Amino acid sequence: MGARVAVAGASGYSGGELLRLIAAHPELELAVATAASHAGQPIGAVHPHLVDLADQVFAPTDPAVLGDADVVFLALPHGQSAAIAATLPESALVVDIGADFRLRDPAAWAKFYGGTHAGTWTYGLPELPGARAEIAKSRRIANPGCYVTAATLALAPLFAAHLVDPDDVVIVAASGTSGAGRSLKPNLLASEVMGSLAAYKVGGVHQHTPEIEQNLSQAAGEPVTVSFTPILAPLPRGILATCTARPKAGVDGDAIRAALANAYHDEPFVHLLPPDVWPQTAATLGSNSVHLQAAFDEAARRVVVVAALDNLTKGAAGQAIQNANIALGFPETTGLTRSGVAP
């Protein structure tokens, strides 16, 4: 029998993706799935694609229901995880997909999320230097944001190698509508989204901005300032992030590619594509993979790194499973796939 798992907030898109991955995981057993608005309903009524779990019934999101599990995944709206987490036994492995424990700076939390900062947990981006060792000994893990994962994996090796300047970083990233959650919003109606792209939270106000800056500043060893513009794209899932920065003197395209290759040559889920092959979201769907490609714009003196990932998998549920695998001592790739389902 595998580790007993609870998923809080399992009726949402990230929660549903967690259920899909848990059902196929040889070392995890779903003990309970909770959903405040769907308590008492069968999982199959909300997630008809989850045939193996269709008859299991959603429980209320109650700490007493979650406390018996060995592993608890929190897939709750931002600001709701802290209260639940405080009631769970210290022996349980808790992975929070929300933002409650990602930021180290309470002022940044107050500015971008509001309310009281709940604290900081071990940051669960395994591909960062030293992260696996910290994750392996932790029982509380904060899963990174989806945009943050794409931007950090694209640029962190360049900052670590001191190849780019810290004060001229521009990230423009398009995401599918599932990144906005499952609750009804007028701007997510099919008639509003189909055939249209829309920028939103422009001008440094998106809540992932301080998290991106936190990660890149850590890699650089000095403060990094980022201009981040998110775009809502007419597709259900996937992120394509175009990340640019100003190179330091003497840096060329070969140095950029070498830094990325050196950082990720042994990584199971980060793939630097062959030269001139550019990332596309469709190639990553359903997988825990990130696809990267880089270019050097000599005329504009800009480094360009493009990243593609599935926002629900490597950007959320898949990364949570990856973190749990590390913390539980399982092979890191257990229950996860590197290959997408395109076309």
From Swiss-Prot:
**Catalyzed chemical reaction(s):** N-acetyl-L-glutamate 5-semialdehyde + phosphate + NADP(+) = N-acetyl-L-glutamyl 5-phosphate + NADPH + H(+)
- Going by the entry's taxonomy, the superkingdom of the source organism is recorded as Bacteria
GO function terms (MF aspect): N-acetyl-gamma-glutamyl-phosphate reductase activity; NAD binding; NADP+ binding
Q: In which pathway does it act?
A: Amino-acid biosynthesis; L-arginine biosynthesis; N(2)-acetyl-L-ornithine from L-glutamate: step 3/4
- GO cellular component terms attached to this protein's record: cytoplasm
The record's similarity note reads: Belongs to the NAGSA dehydrogenase family. Type 1 subfamily.
UniProt protein name: N-acetyl-gamma-glutamyl-phosphate reductase
User: From which source organism is this entry?
Assistant: Acidothermus cellulolyticus (strain ATCC 43068 / DSM 8971 / 11B)
